[in-house]
UniProtKB/Swiss-Prot annotation:
Belongs to the LysR transcriptional regulatory family. One of its GO terms (molecular function) is DNA-binding transcription factor activity. It holds the Pfam family HTH_1. This is Hydrogen peroxide-inducible genes activator. Required for the induction of a regulon of hydrogen peroxide inducible genes such as catalase and glutathione-reductase. One of its GO terms (biological process) is regulation of DNA-templated transcription. Keywords: Activator, DNA-binding, Transcription, Transcription regulation.
Amino acid sequence: MNIRDLEYLVALSEYKHFRRAADSCNVSQPTLSGQIRKLEDELGIILLERTSRKVLFTQSGMLLVDQARTVLREVKLLKEMASNQGKEMTGPLHIGLIPTVGPYLLPYIVPMLKAAFPDLEVFLYEAQTHQLLEQLETGRLDCAIVATVPETEAFIEVPIFNEKMLLAVSEHHPWAQESKLPMNQLNGQEMLMLDDGHCLRNQALDYCFTAGAKENSHFQATSLETLRNMVAANAGITFMPELAVLNEGTRKGVKYIPCYSPEPSRTIALVYRPGSPLRNRYERVASAVSDEVKSILDGLK
């Protein structure tokens, strides 16, 4: 048994498909399948129930996968400790971002990170929160920029900024001329929402339900841009995060209205694994991103 075998096993548990797991490990499917069988022979247990349709792990297999994840995390920590000797801001940095933040934050922070930390080789990944946290847990990501939710409490959270949510309405909507609105005005309104898996959906719904609004049950969007286009078509109203509204003031068809009592918002944070020897690296990146966002938002006031 070696570290590579454990990586094959964990990849198979994530993809539940031999070819996709092999592709993720940059090996052929026969190689991965053969190593899994050798691992079973070495341990004297059956790890998988192999069917023509899907891969199922036995109870023993699931226990071994959990332990393999732990071993791989510790191996990554050892490598980080070795590479961290005098090279805190040097080397690869794998950052994940959620889809409701990434497209609007990256154009600002990518050039900033290159200028501030020229020796960092930054790799960027976009996925929903639960996927990012899984990859963070397994060590595939070093850190992630997400909206704080209960699931992020298992990690170290470094708040970057507090992001307002603005009410987006069609320019033909009766509220289009309002400069601001109290949240109780939403009582009885139907709101367009993102589909399941987006943390913004749950955060927006909490504010909506408290105000007496409800979700439009006939439509769910996969992206903020779809929501924006639906609003422009006067097909409904929704909440949009502040960064997604930057430079959108001149777009025809949509008006953005601040709300109050309470002001809807969410906290965007950089999260990383507890115990990481590269803590200072992540804290410095978080601080730099926070300063950049603050300067952007202050410039709009």
